[in-house]
């Protein structure tokens, strides 16, 4: 599933290129997770003002209303002035005077939803429960520690939940916990402020590094140019079960948490 780094890489790939463009047509393919919530022709003639990101959602601001776009489990976007005819997995085209933004989503768990503003019921439903943005100034250490202290679940599960901090997917949670020296099974409520500070910094560092590397391509992800990310090639623990830790040489262990694979070093992480 595309996580925060992949969504941010996607946003940066087309945001400036589509800004100011007039919408000429909207094509809808097979049904996605949620309906568009507006007749496609109602968007024709409107202009794209900017593209923002909130967690794993892209917010495409129009001169009236906005589109909330989620890539789902397997989605990716392309933006080009001359795209080929839509393929079997191309389910949404936003055709503008500057190019077409196309959503390819084989599993169809993604969605594009129109709302009038961020106070609209669907916007609140999709965005209202999201935690802090980890890459901006709003990622406050005190609030982060307080959020952890309220949760008795394993810290990795809390990171994945998205209501304390958004966008920390499975690979990034494993990597951040290793960098912070925290065992993924430790109850979040037991994390002291100094350890929370290390994890806070580690989450920032890992996600920023992942964006710099173009995200991670574990299965389907590619950016708007069709290129894969390569952060996963530099992972310190993720995908390395049985291999020696790069710090202490202890074999990396694999366990299952909530149906997700967790990788950690039993010596470096306490």
Curated annotation (Swiss-Prot):
DNA binds at residues 89, 107, 151. CDD domains: EcFpg-like_N. Keywords: DNA damage, DNA repair, DNA-binding, Glycosidase, Hydrolase, Lyase, Metal-binding, Multifunctional enzyme, Zinc, Zinc-finger. GO terms for molecular function: 8-oxo-7,8-dihydroguanine DNA N-glycosylase activity; class I DNA-(apurinic or apyrimidinic site) endonuclease activity; damaged DNA binding; zinc ion binding. InterPro entries: DNA_glyclase/AP_lyase_DNA-bd, DNA_glyclase_Znf_dom_DNA_BS, Formamido-pyr_DNA_Glyclase, FPG_cat, MutM-like_N-ter, Ribosomal_uS13-like_H2TH, Znf_DNA_glyclase/AP_lyase, Znf_FPG/IleRS. Binds 1 zinc ion per subunit. PROSITE patterns: FPG_CAT, ZF_FPG_1, ZF_FPG_2. Its cofactor is Zn(2+). Gene3D superfamilies: 1.10.8.50, MutM-like, N-terminal. Pfam families: Fapy_DNA_glyco, H2TH, zf-FPG_IleRS. One of its GO terms (biological process) is base-excision repair. A zinc finger (FPG-type) spans 236-270. The active site is at 2 (schiff-base intermediate with dna), 3 (proton donor), 56 (proton donor), 260 (proton donor). It catalyses: Hydrolysis of DNA containing ring-opened 7-methylguanine residues, releasing 2,6-diamino-4-hydroxy-5-(N-methyl)formamidopyrimidine; 2'-deoxyribonucleotide-(2'-deoxyribose 5'-phosphate)-2'-deoxyribonucleotide-DNA = a 3'-end 2'-deoxyribonucleotide-(2,3-dehydro-2,3-deoxyribose 5'-phosphate)-DNA + a 5'-end 5'-phospho-2'-deoxyribonucleoside-DNA + H(+). Its EC number is 3.2.2.23, 4.2.99.18. It comes from the Bacteria. SUPFAM superfamilies: Glucocorticoid receptor-like (DNA-binding domain), N-terminal domain of MutM-like DNA repair proteins, S13-like H2TH domain. Monomer. Belongs to the FPG family. Involved in base excision repair of DNA damaged by oxidation or by mutagenic agents. Acts as a DNA glycosylase that recognizes and removes damaged bases. Has a preference for oxidized purines, such as 7,8-dihydro-8-oxoguanine (8-oxoG). Has AP (apurinic/apyrimidinic) lyase activity and introduces nicks in the DNA strand. Cleaves the DNA backbone by beta-delta elimination to generate a single-strand break at the site of the removed base with both 3'- and 5'-phosphates. This is Formamidopyrimidine-DNA glycosylase.
């Amino acid at each position: 599933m595309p996580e925060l780094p992949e969504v941010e890489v996607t946003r940066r790939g087309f945001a400036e290129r589509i800004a100011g463009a007039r919408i000429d047509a909207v094509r809808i393919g097979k049904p996605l997770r949620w309906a568009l919530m507006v007749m496609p022709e109602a968007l024709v003639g409107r202009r794209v003002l900017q593209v923002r990101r909130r967690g794993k959602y892209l917010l495409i601001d129009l001169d009236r209303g906005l589109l909330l776009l989620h890539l789902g489990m397997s989605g990716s976007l392309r933006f080009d002035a001359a795209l080929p005819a839509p393929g079997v997995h191309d389910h949404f085209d936003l055709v503008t005077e500057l190019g077409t933004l196309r959503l390819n989503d084989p599993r169809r768990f993604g969605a594009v939803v129109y709302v009038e503003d961020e106070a609209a019921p669907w916007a609140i439903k999709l965005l209202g429960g999201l935690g802090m943005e980890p890459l901006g100034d709003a990622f406050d250490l005190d609030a982060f520690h307080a959020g952890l202290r309220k949760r008795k679940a394993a810290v990795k599960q809390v990171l994945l939940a998205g209501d304390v901090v958004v966008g920390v997917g499975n690979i990034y949670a494993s990597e951040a916990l290793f960098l912070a020296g925290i065992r993924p099974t430790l109850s979040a409520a037991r994390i002291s402020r100094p350890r929370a500070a290390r994890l806070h910094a580690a989450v920032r560092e890992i996600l920023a590094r992942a964006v710099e590397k173009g995200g991670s391509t574990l299965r389907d992800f590619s950016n708007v140019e069709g290129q894969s990310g390569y952060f996963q090639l530099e992972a310190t623990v993720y995908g390395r079960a049985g291999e020696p830790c790069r710090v202490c040489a202890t074999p990396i262990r694999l366990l299952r948490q909530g149906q997700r694979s967790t990788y950690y070093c039993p010596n470096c992480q306490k």
